[in-house]
Swiss-Prot record:
Domain OBG-type G: 159-330
Listed cofactors: Mg(2+)
Sequence positions that bind GTP: 165-172, 190-194, 212-215, 282-285, 311-313
NCBIfam families for this protein: Obg_CgtA, Obg_CgtA_exten, PRK12296.1, PRK12297.1, PRK12299.1
Annotated localization: Cytoplasm
Signal peptide feature range: none
Organism: Staphylococcus saprophyticus subsp. saprophyticus (strain ATCC 15305 / DSM 20229 / NCIMB 8711 / NCTC 7292 / S-41)
PANTHER family per record: DEVELOPMENTALLY REGULATED GTP-BINDING PROTEIN-RELATED, MITOCHONDRIAL RIBOSOME-ASSOCIATED GTPASE 2
Protein name: GTPase Obg
GO CC term, one of those recorded: cytoplasm
Subunit-structure text: Monomer.
Presence of the UniProt keyword Cell inner membrane in the record: no
Amino acid sequence: MFVDQVKISLKAGDGGNGITAYRREKYVPFGGPAGGDGGDGASIIFEVDEGLRTLLDFRYQTHFKAKRGDGGQSSNMHGKNAEHLVLKVPPGTIIKSADSEEVLADLVENGQRAVVAKGGRGGRGNSRFASPRNPAPDFSENGEPGEEIEVTLELKLLADVGLVGFPSVGKSTLLSIVSKAKPKIGAYHFTTIKPNLGVVSTKDQRSFVMADLPGLIEGASEGIGLGHQFLKHVERTKVIVHMIDMSGSEGRDPYEDYKVINEELSAYEHRLEERPQIVVANKMDMPNAEDNLALFKEEINDDSVHIIPLSTFKHDHIDELLYAIADKLEAVKDIDFSKDEEEDLGVNRVVYKHTPSQDKFTITRDDDAAYVVSGKAIERMFKMTDFNSDPAVRRFARQMRSMGIDDALRARGCRNGDIVRILGGEFEFVE
């Protein structure tokens, strides 16, 4: 089964908790603090595996949670870092934030990696807080929470050649002849509803990857008939093979078919106009095909359009087509697809990391008049504080003051004894 778009949830591993411990050894008076740091949580990394061709694995498992780091130990021993969770994806996978649709990574080459959800830092042990003023701190820090994000994975096939055209013009039949691919073939429209890939080898030992794309219809560039799902796979092909039913057996005019498909390609992505194209006049074994081809050439009236007449039924001129495709591929330069897509979409692509929002905090009111403080920075500190330790609670209060939260609460009208909430935890405001 071919799957080219999925939505999944990611939760990177939390950092391990630091520990409060002291050095207790014979003949070592005033040993001091000896609590070790927690280990770092596991990040979630996407890696390209050239052996994959679909996102099928992500259809049945949509939630991924990485492991947390181990806790710190006494004698200043650091907790073990968690092993990163590596998710394999096929070449051509684009990772977007499900909320903002920002492109987080565009993975093309085999082995390419992108860290999309970063694991939390391990919490610090009490020895890390020692100072001349407080040489034996009796508190430690919890691990930092790992990032949590929903992403959309979108696959754009990486094929050298894309077969385009109206339904039932012979695209799947051609692919089955020139490669070992076994696409579904039937005497009805839209037999192919998912792209098929095949590796093609010419008699002079040249090879390329060909994609049989589902049939297009008028309005495909506007999404009609699942047009967007099909057209996106054309974007990354280097050569377009435009197949036309020259017999007109479906009651359509070959020249009109040619114009409509090219207009849809241009409307979807204007750079596709510049992509090398070979026109395949198929079904030349049928009645009226020769006359239709002569009229077609007359209507185009452009010698630069490369037209190859053939019959997939009789296997005529197949080698001529394959040689022409191989020649076009050798002549075309490498195309930087990612750059083109960024210019069109106006996106800022962030590869190998996800940068969260840096908002400090916001203050709102609950229905019971309690003040609610929210924001990534303060919520991160809240989760990393051990509220079973009075010194840790006092440190959290100092951090709130240094961030300006106390002053902001006063400005909002908060008075002595009022309730302040952070992530469900309740505090009493004290002047």
